[in-house]
Amino acid sequence: MPSSVSWGILLLAGLCCLVPVSLAEDPQGDAAQKTDTSHHDQDHPTFNKITPNLAEFAFSLYRQLAHQSNSTNIFFSPVSIATAFAMLSLGTKADTHSEILEGLHFNLTEIPEAQVHEGFQELLRTLNQPDSQLQLTTGNGLFLNESLKLVDKFLEDVKKLYHSDAFTVNFGDTEEAKKQINDYVEKGTQGKIVDLVKELDRDTVFALVNYIFFKGKWERPFEVKDTKEEDFHVDEVTTVKVPMMRRLGMFNIHYCEKLSSWVLLMKYLGNATAIFFLPDEGKLQHLENELTHDIITKFLENENRRSASLHLPKLSITGTYDLKRVLGQLGITKVFSNGADLSGVTEEAPLKLSKAVHKAVLTIDEKGTEAAGAMFLEAIPMSIPPEVKFNKPFVFLMIEQNTKSPLFVGKVVNPTQK
């Protein structure tokens, strides 16, 4: 192939498409370390070693997105993005390799690289365990051009460590290749993410796709009949009407002085919890700057049940991001440049990551994300409960309880914004 032709990678909802670059340097040694998964300490699962890093990556990425715009909703999956790039790092070398892992908040002087990949392997295995009450699945797919020969070790590692499926496609037929990739993601997300790939470079030779799908029911649902239209204050001058779910009951809710925010934890049936943060007026940026893995862990470990009159907007939001810009702010730049070293993926031609796009969708309603026929009764103290209205911008996270991993992070500025 002529050296003037450029190949690249595309990452959508975790999709990475690889396509060649015009120059390549000699490999500077295999940066990947051998990963030994022959044994696991059952009392200290390996995913525990990477969960703090995932959380800090999540908050760093969130702050970059918030910095780009304070007037738009935010919603993304840190687990999806980190999994895709950690998997890609298996095929990178030299600075390209170290930048990705450091950008994901892994310090290889503190945690061996073998444990990073072993942690993702265990995390994905745990997330994909069947749960009769909660639907949570992740998937990784490799789409290879018919003529491309991958390095055997890379193919073995992504299958073994990241449970990846491999498919052969003809990227010369861009429409058919797009259809195959989009069908894979649409099926994996049960129709929630469709037409993920809008455009596909004819020179693409390799696509790496990661998706995560979550569908849960509130442990204690809202009554549809209690949902009423109320005002949501987008900013000092903008107010919109939104359907507001309402319930008087016992909640794991408290006011946090450190964050200047109300903190609400709502469990899903199964092993997931949503954490909502409602900051005081003018304290949104303070909240965003103060959130850390340690704070989230303390909230998850402590129960603060009290009576409250809760008002939470019913909403459906979508987040779509070009990650090249935002990850560049986190130090991940080399993989997008002509100096990228992806010789661990294939030795046939130099590659670079041409595009990285992430898409995530969220629906919050009375039952969670699907209808549920649950009924329950609870005693309410006679004292007058506080009224907590999420009727202004707020931040939220969705946490998988077994792994304490941040499945999704978001901010609602305007519930009517699609």
From Swiss-Prot:
Annotated signal peptide: 1-24
Main location: secreted
InterPro entries: Serpin_CS, Serpin_dom, Serpin_fam, Serpin_sf, Serpin_sf_1, Serpin_sf_2
Record key words, sorted: Acute phase, Glycoprotein, Phosphoprotein, Protease inhibitor, Secreted, Serine protease inhibitor, Signal
UniProt superkingdom: Eukaryota
Modified residues (Phosphoserine): S38, S383
4Fe-4S recorded as keyword: no
Record GO terms (molecular function): serine-type endopeptidase inhibitor activity
Tissue-by-tissue expression: Plasma.
Protein's cellular compartments: Secreted
Glycosylation sites: N70, N107, N271
Function as written in the Swiss-Prot or TrEMBL entry: Inhibitor of serine proteases. Its primary target is elastase, but it also has a moderate affinity for plasmin and thrombin. Inhibits trypsin, chymotrypsin and plasminogen activator.
Domain comment (free text): The reactive center loop (RCL) extends out from the body of the protein and directs binding to the target protease. The protease cleaves the serpin at the reactive site within the RCL, establishing a covalent linkage between the carboxyl group of the serpin reactive site and the serine hydroxyl of the protease. The resulting inactive serpin-protease complex is highly stable.
PANTHER family: ALPHA-1-ANTITRYPSIN (PTHR11461:SF165), SERINE PROTEASE INHIBITOR, SERPIN (PTHR11461)
Stated name of the protein: Alpha-1-antitrypsin
Organism: Pongo abelii (Sumatran orangutan)
Organism lineage: Eukaryota, Metazoa, Chordata, Craniata, Vertebrata
